[in-house]
Structures are given as structure tokens and as C-alpha cells.
Amino acid sequence: SPYLLQHSSNPVWWQEWSAEIIQYAVDGKKPLFVSVGYATCHWCHVMAAEAFSDIDTANFLNSHFICIKVDREQRPDIDQFMMQYLTALSGNGGWPLNVFLTADLRPIYALTYAPVRSSGPQQSFLSIAKKVHEYYEKNADDIEPFITKEVHPPIAGEESLVKNLLSYYDPDYGGFDPGQKFPPHSTLLYLLYFLCVENNPDVQTICRKTLDAMRLGGLNDHLQGGIFRYCVDRQWTIPHFEKMLYDQAMALWCYSLAYKVIGKSEYKKMAESIVRCLDDCFADNGLFISAHDADTEHVEGATYVWSYTELKDFLGPDEFKRFCASYDIDEQGNFEGLIHLIRKNDVSLYDIEDKLLFLRNKRAQPARDNKIICGINALVAIAMIQAGRNLERPELEEKAAQIIRRLIDLFWDGKTLGHSYYNGAKQNKNFLFDAAALLTAISMIYENDASWNTLMTTIAAYVESFRDGEKWVESRAADFQQVFASWFDHPIPSSVSLAEMGRTRVALLTGKETKFKSYRASYQADFFNITVMMNNGLFHVISSKSAVAWSELSPNTLQTRGETQTDCYRGTCRVLKEK
């Protein structure tokens, strides 16, 4: 893991999570200090450079705890357990996620970032660690276990979903958060599919305003394509500069669908710029790496921002005038005296943007997390399939099929599905998210080519192995306790939502009955609610002897092969005339 390697020079004696190291702690009656993060996490870098590089802190941790580093992207089950405890304890979450536990995994205390030195009311990490150890020494036998529960959003009525989303919506700037603005991928997808069923002017406004704010503002990399993780302000001005693969996949799906549903050409342009970013920045031997760091040489955003003088001197007078007419260029800057590029309009400036990108590429670049994650790559395949259909670019669908074949070759052994691949080594832990995302992708490519049927059926059965009665579990890893799968659809679809979509699609495509599902609370379970639409008859299921061109179909459509051409929708099937 690139993340674990980032901490290899710390004086803290970090261990990797394993059954053996947990048993060692049990045998030695020593508590655990578990720190969870990921390779492109800014505050993880800060803590690595501060507290975890401090000799006094390291000596105390090494003497009194077994210290374990966890890459959350490699062990989502451990991350989810620790995060549930942190949020139950404090009401907040985040990374680095630092948890003190007994050797038998009873949590003692949890926190995110803490400085190396105390400052006013903010305690140093070392002082916190000392208090935790003192508490443990006095109360070890009385510390209660933390029992994880299946936390699912409440059932909601169909009529309340859009109404509730309207109440969360920011009418001034778009999006749904009152402060920091995260791209609301699943919410946008739900609303866009809703527009396929009902042309609601308020929903049109929400989608347009949010999609335009995301593509014109600071979330978008206007030179390279692709989007950053989130914006730190309500106005979508300054991003947290990391680029995550999952954001590119979800944004590609959103913008291609928005083009198909709303018809605005700028959404097609945005989708195609994300494809370019994937090819130029994330592609690796037929698959895609996980992320690009927010920092360049320990400075956040250094690769992406410009000085006013730099822009003015590099561009010719006419170019600079044209550039300032389309970009919001202030001599005082908008980010620590420098300029992060934000568009004012959609005037084409390809010549200038390519020139600036050429210069930018000569700078030092952010570190890359070169880990290949099965489920996130499956999300890319899903997005490529949908973009191919929505943009009428069938080569993207073929590219998606190649991604799926590569994932099967790399991760599927005929019985179980591996999780990640890095530097020649494959991690064979099995997670619902990977299986569910892959099943959903296969079910989409099956619509083009029925020869995928056997594999689709096999992976569908594998997904069902993650059921525990009526509940889904994220993993059955032998070195950790069972954790129920997440329902929360941000920033990406949850494991539960992907599993339900995959199994619903397979049922509809193979002529099996589906049971009525209830909608869940909006904003928490928006991707799940797309599956409810599908399950409850709000997606067309077209059956025909030969494939119907996707350009002729509504986006809320599945299609499969049959002897007669039928369209099943809202509980009624009608025979269509053969063309």
C-alpha cells in the first residue's frame, strides 16, 4: 500500500493489520493504537510529519501500545467499524482516524487530527495518548465492547423525496451543503432519472444549477479535465485538490446522463473532458489507479494554482485579454495570493488552455496512489457504459467491456473476488462493494452481448454470499469481526445500494419477478432510490430479438433479448411493432 509506505520512516513501530499481530497483542496483554488513513489524505500527511515523527510521542506509543497502520481503501471493513465508533463517540468523522482499543477490539477512545504540541484548549496527541493509557490501566476490565449495527436510512414516501431534496438545496450557489460543497453524485443521478419519469421544473433547476456550478467553478480542472474532491466554500471556489478515481467515475455518469436528459451541449463537453482525464491521468495497463494527492512537495494545490504575473507574462496580450474575459482573474488572487482557475462563461479557449496545461505539466506533480481497486474500477466501467450510450460513443462501451475482462482476469479466481493490486501484489480480501459494483457493470454490458450471461449469473450468486439473513455484510474476513454493509450513498453508492441494483437488474434482465421495495430517506440513500424506481416499474424493460439502438431509448431503460418486442413499464407490458 502506498499509504503504509508513506509511514515507513516514522519512529513509531507501525505494524500492518493481521491476525498474528492481534494475537501478539492479546498474548502480551497490550492495548492497540490503530491509525486509519489513505495515501492522498492531506491531514494524514500532516500528522505523519508532526506527531508520528516526534520521538517523544513515538517512544510512548511504542512502549505502551501495539501500533497498527491501516489503509482504509484496502480494509474498508476496519475503517467502517472504527468510523462508526468515532461518530458514536463524538458525532463527527474524518481521517486520519485514530482509535485506541483493547487487544480484543473493545474501543477506548477515538479522535482525528491532533497536533504534536498543545495549543490553547487543543491538547497534543501525546497528552491524549497518556490519558488514554492511564484510563486503560485503571479500567481495562470494565471497557465495554462496541457492537456495530446495520444503520439504514428510514423508509420514505415517494412523494417526499424531491420535496426533501428541495429543502436541502442551496438556491444561491447550487449543491446541497450549507458550507463545504461536495459533488452530490448519487443525488444528481436520482434527480436526473426522476426527470425521465416526470418533467419537474424545480428538479430541472436543481440539476442545472448544481451541474453548472461544479463545471464552471473551482471543482473542475479546466485545463486537464476531471474534478477535485470537494470545495471548501459554499461558492464552489477553492477545492481540496486531491483527485479521486471514484469522483471521476461518478461525475462522468452524471454529466453524460445530464446531456441525454437535459440536452445541454456543455454537459457533453464536461463528460468528454473527464474521459480525457481518466485516459491521461489515471490509466494504468488497462485499468485505473486510485488517486492523485492534494499536495505537491508538501504544498496543497501547488501544481494547479497560478500567480497573476505568471499568467500575464506567459500569455500574449491578446491571449491574456481573451483569457480574462472568460476566467475570473483577480490580481490579488483567490487562494493565498495565487489564482485557482474559475470560469465565468463557456467561450471556447482550447488554444490558451492547452498552452497553460503544457506549462503546468512541466511543474512538479502530485504524488499518485497507484493502487488498483477492483470495485472502483468497476464503477469506471459502469460510467463508461452509460457515457457510451448517453453520448452515442459506442467505443466507450467496448472500453468498459475491456475493463471488466481485465478485472476478471486480475481478481476473480473462480470462487472469490480480490480487492486491490499494487506493485505486483494482489490483496485477496473479499468485500461486498467490489462484487456488487462488478455485478452491476456486467449486467450493463450483458445488455449489449448475451454471452456475458454465465459470468453474470456466477457473480450474482457470489454477491448473495454476503447476505446474513435479510442484511448485507461488507466482509467475512477471518482477521476481523463481521461488519454490516453501509447504506450511505455519499460520496459513492453504498455497498448495499450497488448490491440491490445488481440483483434487481439481473432479475429484470432474466425475466424473474422482483418484490416491491420502499424508498429510503433522500440525500442519504439516493442511489438506492434509483434501484427502487427500477424495481417498482419506473424503468422501461425492452425485450426484442435484436438490440435496439440506445439513442432511440430513454435513459431509464434496460433491454434484453426475447422472441417478441415488448416494453414493460409501470406494471404494464405492451407489444411493440418490429422495425
What name fits each language-model region?
Residues 40, 227, 251, 384, ...:
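Extended, hydrophobic alpha-helical segments in both membrane/secreted and soluble proteins
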Residues 205, 209, 269, 273, ...:
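Primarily a tetratricopeptide repeat
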